[in-house]
Regions:
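Active-site acidic/histidine clusters and adjacent loop/turn architecture
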Residues: 49, 54-120, 180-189, 194-197
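Extended, low-complexity, intrinsically disordered C-terminal regulatory tails
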Residues: 45-48, 100-132, 201-223
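Short, solvent-exposed beta-strand-terminating loops
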Residues: 59-60, 147-157
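Bacterial N-terminal signal peptides that target proteins for export
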Residues: 1-6
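Catalytic cores and adjacent binding grooves of peptidoglycan-active enzymes
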Residues: 22-35, 39, 155-306
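Extracytoplasmic
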Residues: 112-114, 138-142, 231-233
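Short, surface-exposed glycine/acidic/tryptophan-bearing loops
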Residues: 132-149
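C-terminal motif of bacterial Sec signal peptides marking the signal peptidase cleavage site
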Residues: 14-16
Length: 306
């Protein structure tokens, strides 16, 4: 059991689109890892379920090794948002995530040139690993928000498949490009200032730009975390709902606004450190296979069977 816990922590720390990871040991104590001998590949099961499970809403596990019960669906179109890429069926989440997106979209609609938000991937109906794309987004507490300012919110289903967001980065993410606007900064500030938010992943140059421009209270910058990619969208991760057993939060970001750290990312993009010499005596890292249902929190077996 000890070896299993260590393996879970190490694998989760390497998951993509969910970096900056430090696990909460207290939360892990309430996550069941026993009672399942189901060795089916988890993404092949969770990725093909079309509807949410019964029962009250609840997240189990962590962003890159978990699932969700009682998920609700973000309506495909609302007064200030549209869900994109409907064919993926990834506009499901925990109720607080849906509420958060709707709240943020109402703020976005107050910004010049923005009718609201185009919302990218959230989670699958029962969370869990996906057939393609993200390693995270498994517990109903993650959402991708497009950088493209919506100029209309009556896109057809076909248009939502073909329309693409736009990149905000220049010089491999060291700087923002000419598409970046004060409205992007205002929306990100509002997104990060919400107490429901744990962190937001964004390319380094955008964080450095906001650090330069921020005035007054800068505490919200702490939640903006530099990470690879994330220039066509920003990735919001919410905290586990208060009092939820079985949901594992990451540790909070380090104290401070994180601006020096983001500048360090930029410096390394512009002046990459020399590669480390290969160790001829190093033991090759074994390849990790896809997650099995038996490797997810034990509650996920019930989630997939209900």
């Amino acid at each position: 059991m000890v070896r299993l816990s260590i393996a879970i922590a190490l694998i989760a720390a390497l998951a993509s689109c969910g970096g900056d990871k430090t696990s909460s040991q207290a939360a892990k104590a309430s996550i069941s890892t026993q009672g399942s001998s189901d060795n089916r590949v988890a993404k092949e099961v969770f990725g093909r379920v079309a509807t949410s499970s019964s029962g009250r809403p609840q997240s189990f596990g962590e962003d890159a090794r978990g699932c969700q019960a009682g998920a609700v669906q973000l309506p495909q179109t609302g007064p200030t948002w549209q869900a994109m890429r409907l064919s993926r069926n990834r506009n499901w989440a925990q109720p607080q995530t849906v509420d958060y997106i709707q709240d943020l979209s109402r703020f976005a609609a107050t910004q010049s040139g923005w009718s609201g938000l185009y919302v990218g991937d959230m989670s699958q109906p029962r969370g869990g690993p996906m057939l393609t794309g993200h390693a995270s987004h498994q517990t109903g507490l993650d959402a991708d928000i497009w950088m493209l300012p919506p100029n209309r919110l009556n896109l057809s289903a076909a248009e939502r498949e073909s329309l693409s967001s736009i990149s905000m980065r220049r010089a491999s993410g060291a700087f923002v490009n000419s598409s970046w606007t004060p409205q992007h900064e205002a929306i990100l500030k509002a997104a990060a200032s919400d107490p429901r938010v744990a962190r937001i992943f964004l390319f380094p140059g955008a964080k450095v730009e906001m650090c330069k421009n921020a005035t007054g209270d800068r505490s919200w910058l702490r939640k903006i975390r530099p990470w690879w990619g994330h220039h066509y969208h920003f990735h919001v991760r919410l905290n586990c709902p208060a009092g939820t057993a079985g949901c594992e939060d990451q540790a909070p970001p380090p104290p401070g606004d994180g601006c020096a750290e983001a500048q360090g990312w930029v410096d390394r993009i512009l002046n990459p450190p020399p590669p480390k010499p290969a160790d001829p005596n190093a033991t090759p890292t074994p390849r990790r296979g896809p997650l099995k249902i038996s490797q997810l929190p034990g509650q996920c077996t019930s989630v997939i069977n209900n």
